[in-house]
């Protein structure tokens, strides 16, 4: 499990570095404005939160991860990396 966590963290770090370098390159080419970078990141985070909330509505092993009308996962379920995980 620790290996999976380490791989996930390293993958995220590489993706962030790649995203920042690509954004800097586009900024240098005057394709995007510097303030647009942060707007895009905020939108991405909102999309991920939505995906995470949506995935918790999916039933795992016949049990709902999140009760109807609830905003958070319940019953020992947690939403991690767009998956319902039982803790």
From Swiss-Prot:
Instruction: Give the keywords, sorted.
Output: Disulfide bond, Ion channel impairing toxin, Knottin, Secreted, Signal, Toxin
Recorded hits in InterPro entries, A to Z, give: Hwtx-2-like
A single GO cellular-component term on record: extracellular region
A GO MF label = toxin activity
Instruction: Please state the span of the N-terminal signal peptide per the UniProt entry.
Output: 1-23
- Chief location category: secreted
Q: Which cysteines are joined by disulfide bonds?
A: 52-65, 56-79, 73-84
Location of the protein in the cell: Secreted
The source's domain of life comes to Eukaryota
**Which residues make up the pro-peptide?**
24-48
- Tissues in which the UniProt entry reports expression: Expressed by the venom gland.
What is the recorded function of this protein according to its Swiss-Prot or TrEMBL entry? Probable ion channel inhibitor.
Family, according to the entry, reads as follows: Belongs to the neurotoxin 12 (Hwtx-2) family. 03 (juruin) subfamily.
Q: What is this protein called?
A: U3-theraphotoxin-Cg1b
């Amino acid at each position: 499990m620790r290996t999976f966590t380490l791989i996930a963290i390293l993958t995220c770090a590489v993706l962030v570095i790649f995203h920042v370098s690509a954004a800097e390159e586009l900024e240098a080419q005057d394709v995007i404005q510097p303030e647009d970078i942060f707007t895009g990141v905020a939108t991405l985070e909102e999309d991920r939160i939505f995906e995470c909330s949506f995935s918790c509505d999916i039933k795992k092993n016949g049990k709902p991860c999140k009760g109807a009308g609830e905003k958070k996962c319940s019953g020992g379920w947690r939403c991690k990396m767009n998956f319902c995980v039982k803790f």
